[in-house]
Amino acid sequence: MSPTALVTGATGFVGAALTRQLLRSGWSVAIVTRPSSDFSAVEDFISQVDAYVYDGKTQSIIEILEKVRPDVVFHVASLVLTQHTPEQVESLISSNVLFGTQLLEAMVLAGVKKFINTSTTWQYFGEENKQSVNLYAATKKAYEEVIDYYNDAHDISVISLVLSDTYGIGDRRVKLINLLIDAVRRDEKISMSPGDQIVDVSHVYDVVRSFESAAQDLIEATSTVNLKFAISGARLSVKELVAEVERVSGKKINAEFGGRAYRIREVMAPPVLPLYISKWSKVDLGEGIKELLNSKVK
């Protein structure tokens, strides 16, 4: 019998890619959506999943868990803001702390014990990696305290996967690698930071394979676990990333290094964390860039 997954954030880039991967592998998949969810990027699989609407109330997610009773919950949903305004504080707390807490409470009531959480390297900032880059990262860190409680008090097994930069076809987010691809296509000047910061770039295929593999680890675990691993791809400086896009495309990028300052609280190098070891061959960065260049999806 195929396992059942409940996925939050399935209409986003990583969540949608994860849902597709689980379906390819034979999982039965249910997704949690909101009344405002945009399904335009998931039309290829929406008919293959059971979609449930979460209205913001605890009872709503309780009823969803009672109906689905998944083998594993994949919590990918989050509100990502590099900088926030006072008007966005409530949304950050609601999306990144409240919703996840409601989800864990519903898991307890439904007897669901396996949970894959999504973390961010922005939770590890400063000399000892104890600070958060921004309020978004601080809410993610606060939520992990909630996870620890449910793990300890209710024996929910957890693997948190820490993401850095992700990329792939269909990514509509404003990400550096997408900006570089656009610069190649349009032959436009791009204003950049000095470019000495180190980034860690992972193809979304490797990310979702890691999620699926971690879920299998939970299914096979014989005791309650609470583990955390980083997903790592290619580590290189921004200048080196520009050079790699130039190499693969065969075109010079009109990059103005130093055209803008580093961001406030710029991360100059990703934290060194225990890595999730892949059981497959990862997508080479050059091949991933070639895939983006050849894609008509922008």
Segment roles from a protein language model:
Residues 27-37:
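Conserved glycine-rich Rossmann-like NAD(P)H-binding loop of the short-chain dehydrogenase/reductase
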Residues 8, 32, 73-77, 115-121, ...:
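SDR active-site strand-loop-helix element
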Residues 188, 192-298:
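C-terminal substrate-binding subdomain of Rossmann-fold SDR/epimerase-dehydratase oxidoreductases
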Residues 5-25:
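N-terminal Rossmann NAD(P)H-binding glycine-rich loop of SDR-like oxidoreductase domains
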Residues 79-83, 119-128, 164-167:
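Active-site segment of SDR-like NAD(P)-dependent oxidoreductases
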Residues 75, 98-136:
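Conserved Rossmann-fold NAD(P)-dependent oxidoreductase catalytic core, especially the SDR/UDP-sugar
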Residues 53-95, 127:
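NAD(P)H-binding glycine-rich loop region in Rossmannoid oxidoreductase-like domains
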